[in-house]
């Protein structure tokens, strides 16, 4: 039987913006899950992932424009710890498959900035810490990890800003990228 766990990570920052706003807005993300408790895993956020959000450090326009296009910068580490798979059984889960999806334009490794009134020329990237591989958000990049019933499995990543290209200067504004992590396991 194949089971799927979906975890959403949002990387967001009030980047480059010191504007006074007369409008009050709020964003609410509602997530839920229905699972068979006897045949499921516990996925716990780690690192700087707090309530599905990684808050990046503010970067100035000059700092962002000085970066090479396609380079991850001003990073924050985060991850997921997967434990207690198939509770009450003799460790039938031996591996996990992780896939990440998100909105991209021309470069499948850069999440589009989806913030309203957002900065231009900049996006969000995610890199696996285990092998420094930049994650592709088009579903083509699948990572397989072993699973230990005694210690669980740590899925470790870093995320940060990415200058989209050298021809487009970075402008001020908020930055937001949303990545959906799907963790599959077999029972």
Go through each PLM region and give its residues.
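Gram-negative bacterial Sec-dependent N-terminal signal peptides
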Residues: 1-22
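Mature extracellular/passenger domains of Gram-negative fimbrial/pilin and adhesin proteins
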Residues: 20-187
């Amino acid at each position: 039987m194949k089971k799927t766990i979906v975890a959403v990570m949002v990387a967001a920052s009030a980047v480059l913006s010191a504007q006074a706003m007369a409008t009050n807005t709020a964003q609410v993300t509602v997530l839920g899950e229905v699972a068979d408790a006897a045949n499921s895993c516990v996925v716990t956020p780690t690192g700087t992932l707090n309530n599905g959000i990684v808050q990046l450090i503010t970067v100035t326009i000059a700092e962002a424009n000085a970066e090479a296009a396609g380079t991850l910068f001003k990073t924050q580490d985060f991850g997921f710890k997967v434990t207690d798979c198939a509770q009450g059984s003799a460790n039938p889960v031996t591996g996990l498959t992780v896939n990440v999806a998100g909105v991209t334009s021309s470069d499948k490794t850069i999440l589009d900035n989806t913030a309203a009134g957002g900065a231009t020329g900049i996006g969000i990237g995610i890199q696996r810490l285990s092998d420094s591989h930049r994650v592709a958000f088009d579903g083509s990049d699948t990572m397989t990890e072993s699973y230990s019933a005694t210690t669980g499995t740590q899925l470790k990543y870093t995320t940060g800003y990415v200058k989209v290209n050298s021809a487009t200067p970075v402008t001020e504004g908020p930055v937001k990228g949303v990545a959906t992590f799907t963790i599959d396991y077999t029972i």
